[in-house]
Amino acid sequence: MSIFIGGAWPYANGSLHLGHIASLLPGDILARYYRSKGENVLYVSGSDCNGTPIAIRAKQEGVTAKEIADQYHEEFQRCFRSLGFTYDCYTRTDSEHHHETVQNVFLRLLEEGHIYKKIVEQAYCETCTQFLPDRYVEGICPHCHEAARGDQCDACSAILDPLDLLEKKCKLCGSTPSVQETEHFYFALHTFQEQIKRAVEIAKQTGTWRDNAIQLTERYVKEGLLDRAVSRDLPIGVPIPVEGYEDKKIYVWIEAVTGYYSASKHWAEETGKDDQEFWDSEAKTYYVHGKDNIPFHSVIWPAVLLGIGEEAIPRHIVSNEYLTVEKRKLSTSKNWAVWVPDILERYDPDSIRYFLTVNAPENRDTDFSWREFIYSHNSELLGAYGNFVNRTLKFIEKYYGGIVPKRSIEVELKDKVEGLYKHVGEAIEQTKFKVALETIFDAVRFANKYFDEKQPWKQREDDPVSCEETIYNCVYLIANFANLLEPFLPFSSERVRNTLSIVKRNWEPQNTLPSRIDSVQPLFERIDVKQIEHEIEKLYGAVK
């Protein structure tokens, strides 16, 4: 089976925060899981280096957009590597390859009659002497009357045109813009109305899109899909490949999602492999992002793919809700966020991955609290999983000289483990990652209870054979926990596998166990609860 996984492209205009990771982490869990099943996986993403936020920040700081993009693209790569993300291709939208691919898609849509020219009115700043596309305009949403940008309202998810806003202001200088006529290219989105309607109906029947994606897309379809501009007067971006229009750029909403396609093509060129299998109707596709990106993946990207004759429209849309911090909405402008480079300096990446999975905003907004994060690490990772692994392996090291006693696996435990692979695998494929991880940790708690009830410290003297059976079965559980947890907790899983000298990582029960263990070290370290107060003080102290 061919599995395509696309992770949303973060804007390279500032550091990643935990809200980004909460929405993107499911992609890596899926990629690791499907690879362990032996499926053909292509997992791609990249840094959005053409967006308006980058141009605005560059102008504000008096540097080039490329300098800003370079800085954060490199930082993103370091963060994703440190968190264990296993992208097959992580690229950037200001690359020559991406520009060429996007221009080819634009020309194909133009040739097929899906793009046309139109004279329109657009916001123009007399002070800055330039047209103001999308995020260059801020104001009040006409639908919910909350603060909004010119391209979209985060409060109600409405897709907007800058002229829709009430109380419009230029993002650069704060002036009230005027309105002037200009010519732009438009995408005939309305012609895909029935196909998008059918796609959301299928998703609703099969449960392959998150509820928020279904509800929002149904709303767009009910209101009727409107044609959207595909060109803008922007300082950076992909130039329109039409003579006489080279000074205009392809609008980021169509250019950025085409990054999935350009990354796929780039991967094919780099590896010499054929990527077409990931774009036919048999491919299983997952798109992983936050709810603010829903319309771009449930409406616009499917329409673009259909327009160029590709069949692999998004089958699974994994659109998480928002993550708050200490019960307050994340705000990068106010510095109310937990920044990824910062948290990685002090905490185990598996602790971050664990918390953002069991506390994932899968169907509703959830909160990151330092208290819950640290107590979660100490009680679940250290107290449950780490405790079971260490008490078992230390027992072997102390009483058997590191030699694993060879006995038989209990039928009940074997059935339980086989059931775990089945149920956890099904939950992952259905994008129920929290359920999947909680199912494994239920088994971890069962394993601790098993150890306590068997009392090997007593069996060793009263019934040595039973003691060996207990320990052998505990090693069996540990080997399989490391395997089952690999998509979620790759770093600790690798440490366990190294201790047990296990190389095989297929998604199936590990029945062949090691004959000996080496260098047993604690799987996790306890975090001092005094850190809670320190982290909260640091968070409040950084607020602007």
From Swiss-Prot:
<comment type="function">
    <text>Is required not only for elongation of protein synthesis but also for the initiation of all mRNA translation through initiator tRNA(fMet) aminoacylation.</text>
</comment>
<keyword id="KW-0067">ATP-binding</keyword>
<keyword id="KW-0963">Cytoplasm</keyword>
<dbReference type="Pfam" id="PF19303">
    <property type="entry name" value="Anticodon_3"/>
</dbReference>
<keyword id="KW-0862">Zinc</keyword>
<keyword id="KW-0436">Ligase</keyword>
<dbReference type="GO" id="GO:0006431">
    <property type="term" value="P:methionyl-tRNA aminoacylation"/>
</dbReference>
<dbReference type="GO" id="GO:0005829">
    <property type="term" value="C:cytosol"/>
</dbReference>
<feature type="binding site">
    <location>
        <position position="144"/>
    </location>
    <ligand>
        <name>Zn(2+)</name>
    </ligand>
</feature>
<dbReference type="InterPro" id="IPR041872">
    <property type="entry name" value="Anticodon_Met"/>
</dbReference>
<keyword id="KW-0030">Aminoacyl-tRNA synthetase</keyword>
<dbReference type="InterPro" id="IPR014729">
    <property type="entry name" value="Rossmann-like_a/b/a_fold"/>
</dbReference>
<comment type="subunit">
    <text>Monomer.</text>
</comment>
<feature type="binding site">
    <location>
        <position position="156"/>
    </location>
    <ligand>
        <name>Zn(2+)</name>
    </ligand>
</feature>
<dbReference type="InterPro" id="IPR033911">
    <property type="entry name" value="MetRS_core"/>
</dbReference>
<keyword id="KW-0648">Protein biosynthesis</keyword>
<feature type="binding site">
    <location>
        <position position="141"/>
    </location>
    <ligand>
        <name>Zn(2+)</name>
    </ligand>
</feature>
<dbReference type="GO" id="GO:0004825">
    <property type="term" value="F:methionine-tRNA ligase activity"/>
</dbReference>
<dbReference type="GO" id="GO:0005524">
    <property type="term" value="F:ATP binding"/>
</dbReference>
<dbReference type="Pfam" id="PF09334">
    <property type="entry name" value="tRNA-synt_1g"/>
</dbReference>
<feature type="short sequence motif" description="'KMSKS' region">
    <location>
        <begin position="329"/>
        <end position="333"/>
    </location>
</feature>
<dbReference type="GO" id="GO:0046872">
    <property type="term" value="F:metal ion binding"/>
</dbReference>
<dbReference type="InterPro" id="IPR001412">
    <property type="entry name" value="aa-tRNA-synth_I_CS"/>
</dbReference>
<dbReference type="InterPro" id="IPR029038">
    <property type="entry name" value="MetRS_Zn"/>
</dbReference>
<dbReference type="InterPro" id="IPR009080">
    <property type="entry name" value="tRNAsynth_Ia_anticodon-bd"/>
</dbReference>
<keyword id="KW-0547">Nucleotide-binding</keyword>
<feature type="binding site">
    <location>
        <position position="332"/>
    </location>
    <ligand>
        <name>ATP</name>
    </ligand>
</feature>
<feature type="binding site">
    <location>
        <position position="153"/>
    </location>
    <ligand>
        <name>Zn(2+)</name>
    </ligand>
</feature>
<comment type="similarity">
    <text>Belongs to the class-I aminoacyl-tRNA synthetase family. MetG type 1 subfamily.</text>
</comment>
<dbReference type="InterPro" id="IPR014758">
    <property type="entry name" value="Met-tRNA_synth"/>
</dbReference>
<feature type="short sequence motif" description="'HIGH' region">
    <location>
        <begin position="10"/>
        <end position="20"/>
    </location>
</feature>
<dbReference type="InterPro" id="IPR015413">
    <property type="entry name" value="Methionyl/Leucyl_tRNA_Synth"/>
</dbReference>
<dbReference type="InterPro" id="IPR023458">
    <property type="entry name" value="Met-tRNA_ligase_1"/>
</dbReference>
<keyword id="KW-0479">Metal-binding</keyword>
<protein>
    <recommendedName>
        <fullName>Methionine--tRNA ligase 2</fullName>
        <ecNumber>6.1.1.10</ecNumber>
    </recommendedName>
</protein>
